[in-house]
UniProtKB/Swiss-Prot annotation:
Binds the proteasome. Belongs to the cut8/STS1 family. One of its GO terms (cellular component) is nucleus. Gene3D superfamilies: Tethering factor for nuclear proteasome Cut8/Sts1. It is found in: Cytoplasm; Nucleus. Residues 1-28 have a biased composition (Polar residues). The gene is STS1. InterPro entries: Cut8/Sts1_fam, Cut8/Sts1_sf. This is Tethering factor for nuclear proteasome STS1. One of its GO terms (molecular function) is proteasome binding. Keywords: Cytoplasm, Nucleus, Protein transport, Transport.
Length: 327
């Protein structure tokens, strides 16, 4: 009995005849009972051995390749790291400017603020700074006062009377700064600190012009301040001119008065300041008159001496050594 829809190979579904197939006898000992099965097992065993050998060879080749690749990568990474170490630069970090370079980069206002802050923090350095700092020249001192004077003029109001109280109050802080600077610089050019009379008088002359060229404000406070300032400056003129007065026969003052033409300049200052410099003018006149009197007396004395020497004549030939020996 056969299953439906199933047939053996070589059979016809519609044919009911049986076909006999001759097979070797199962009783023959020389013939394998399952020849195809034996061959199949031998072939499979050989194939498996070959596959194992191929797999082993492949694994070995893969292992060698992987080892070679790993070694090459290690060598390359070692070479790369060694090159990187050779090219490596030291670490650089930011740092402030050295003090000389920092001072060099500062402008005038910042440098001035730096010194003032330094004195505020360390007040004991004030005397040292005064001692080691160079003295300003006359030109620099006058220029500084001129700048402060210009600051006063630049702050005057445009649409207002220049001499009014409003104008004065507006420039008052700058006026106070100017007069304070004048006082400080005048003291710097007085003896015995300043030994050169010419320098002192030149500075006083320029400073006096700046003071009386200030706007003539009608404010009473300003008028009093300006008058007092001119009186003090006139006294400083006398201090400078009389510094060597104790020296007997001193002609330096007269020489300076003549070379600088001080008498003419003082006349101008006295006229503009309403006779504030009258004492200075009288002092210079007195010095010039004394010098002229001394010069006239010297000339007169030299003339009298020459006339007396002309009247007294002695013949010294009789008292010569030759005449004495001949006797």
């Amino acid at each position: 009995m056969m299953s439906t829809n199933f047939q053996w190979p070589g059979t016809n579904k519609n044919d009911n005849t049986e076909v006999s197939v001759e097979t070797p006898s199962s009783t023959d000992p020389h013939v394998p009972r399952y020849p195809f099965t034996a061959m199949s097992h031998a072939t499979a065993s050989t194939t498996m051995k070959k596959r194992k050998r191929d797999d082993f060879d492949g694994d070995k080749s893969t292992t060698i390749t992987m080892n070679t690749t790993t070694t090459r990568k290690y060598i390359q990474s070692s070479l790369g790291s060694s090159k990187f170490k050779k090219a490596k630069t030291p670490k650089i970090s930011g740092q402030p400017l050295p003090l000389p370079r920092l001072i060099e980069s500062l402008d005038k206002s910042n440098l001035q603020k730096l010194v003032q802050d330094l004195i505020t923090v360390h007040p004991e350095l004030q005397s040292t700074l005064i001692k080691i700092s160079p003295r300003p020249s006359i030109q620099d001192s006058i220029q500084l006062l001129q700048d402060k004077f210009d600051m006063i003029i630049s702050h005057l109001p445009y649409k207002c009377d220049v001499e009014s109280d409003y104008s004065y109050l507006r420039i008052k802080p700058h006026l106070q700064e100017f007069l304070s600077s004048v006082s400080d610089f005048i003291l710097n050019y007085l003896p015995p600190l300043e030994t050169n009379m010419t320098h002192s008088l030149q500075f006083l002359h320029e400073t006096t012009k700046l003071v009386y060229n200030l706007p003539n404000f009608t404010n009473q406070e300003f008028q009093y301040t300006k008058s007092s300032a001119l009186e003090q400056i006139a006294n400083c003129w006398l201090i400078v001119l009389s510094q060597d007065e104790e020296k007997e026969g001193n002609t330096d003052v007269v020489k300076v008065i003549q070379e600088l033409e001080l008498l003419e300049k003082l006349h101008e200052h006295n006229e503009i300041s309403f006779n504030k410099f009258e004492k200075v003018v009288d002092y210079c006149k007195d010095k010039l008159e004394q010098h002229e009197l001394i010069m006239n007396n010297n000339e007169a004395g030299s003339g009298v001496t020459s006339s007396i020497s002309d009247l007294i004549t002695v013949d010294y030939s009789k008292y010569s050594i030759a005449n004495t020996t001949s006797i």
